[in-house]
Design a protein with these regions (language model features):
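N-terminal hydrophobic targeting signals that begin at the initiator methionine
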Residues: 1-2, 21
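Sec-dependent N-terminal signal peptides
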Residues: 4-14
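Sec/Tat signal peptide C-region and signal peptidase I cleavage site
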Residues: 15-19
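Subset of outer-membrane beta-barrel
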Residues: 20-294
């Protein structure tokens, strides 16, 4: 039995199990800065965003993501951003702090190019003493493990044409592993590449449709795609649906109050074989928009 438990732990901490180092976001279009530094200061006003995602409610050790981002818009072509992200899954926890810089320039009357870089510090920790073992006094699992905050870089580019955009990014470039702790030498980070695209157009007076897609490319894993369609009424009320390929369906609602307070909520249900063991996912987003400087 003891060897079986050790085997399960080793499998759980293999690279295949934790290849998703970076968390999933359903409402990525409302906070694209978490995925690409090219969006730092891109909006017409500065903003602060808080997001909280609780995945697979009812499953012990299910992923939980908390994030805070800030975007500073300036009068020149520069933009700045900051972020704090914490992602938990079982005994694993990832924490990161990041600072972004982006440069925005007009290539023509309707085309804008943005390029951004991110400097971040990332910590990965493993809570071994919280695991339930047959032998509670086993010294191999008597303490927590942390990598400490390690430096990293990220990049992103964005091309906009009127109300349409396409963006490519790699938020974390450097790859680290846990093998110096002799827990599992095969554990290591995988590269995450993101492709985002979206547009918006008016379908009738006061109603705009906003389709978008986000594609994640991770080596040695299937490509993941989020497809979203949101209807915005009077630039205040949002209704949307989303689909993650072979994984989940979601619905969302959002409201903008006094042109500066935005609250969004997304509800997801699994549609894959996971539906037998997982329940729903909730995602909440709060955003404050600063007044535009005259």
């Amino acid at each position: 039995m003891k060897k079986f438990i050790y085997l399960i732990i080793i499998l759980c901490f293999s690279s295949e199990c934790f290849s998703q180092v970076e968390p999933i976001y359903g409402m990525y279009r409302y906070n694209p800065l978490v995925i690409s530094p090219a969006f730092a200061g891109k909006d017409t006003v500065s903003s602060i965003t808080l997001m909280d995602r609780l995945q697979w409610i009812g499953v012990a050790g299910a992923p939980k993501t908390l994030g805070i981002t800030g975007s500073l818009t300036t009068k020149n072509k520069s933009g700045f951003g900051v972020s704090f992200l914490q992602d938990k899954a079982g005994p694993m926890k990832n924490t990161s702090f990041g600072v972004d810089y982006a440069y925005h320039t007009a290539l023509s009357k309707n085309i804008t190019f943005s390029g951004g870089i991110r400097v971040s510090f990332n910590d990965q920790s493993l809570s071994l003493n919280g695991l339930k073992l047959i032998d509670a006094n086993d010294p191999n699992f008597g303490q927590n493990i942390t990598t400490g905050f390690r430096p990293n870089l990220g990049w992103g580019i964005n091309l906009s044409y009127k109300n349409t955009f396409i963006s490519i990014s790699e938020p974390i470039m450097f790859r680290y592993n846990f093998n110096k702790y002799d827990i599992n030498g095969n554990y290591k980070d995988y590269a995450h590449y993101y492709l985002m695209a979206g547009t918006s157009f008016t379908v009738s007076k006061g109603i705009r449709l906003k389709p978008s897609v986000m594609i994640r490319v991770i080596p040695n894993t299937p490509i993941s795609a989020d497809i979203n369609l949101t209807a915005t009424i009077q630039e205040k009320l949002d209704f949307g649906v989303s689909y993650r390929n072979s994984n989940s369906l979601g619905v969302q609602i959002g409201y903008l109050s006094f042109k500066k307070y935005y609250i969004g909520y997304m509800y997801e249900l699994p549609i894959s074989e996971m539906r037998a063991t997982t329940i729903q996912t909730h995602e909440l987003l709060l955003k404050y928009l600063f007044a535009k400087k005259q």
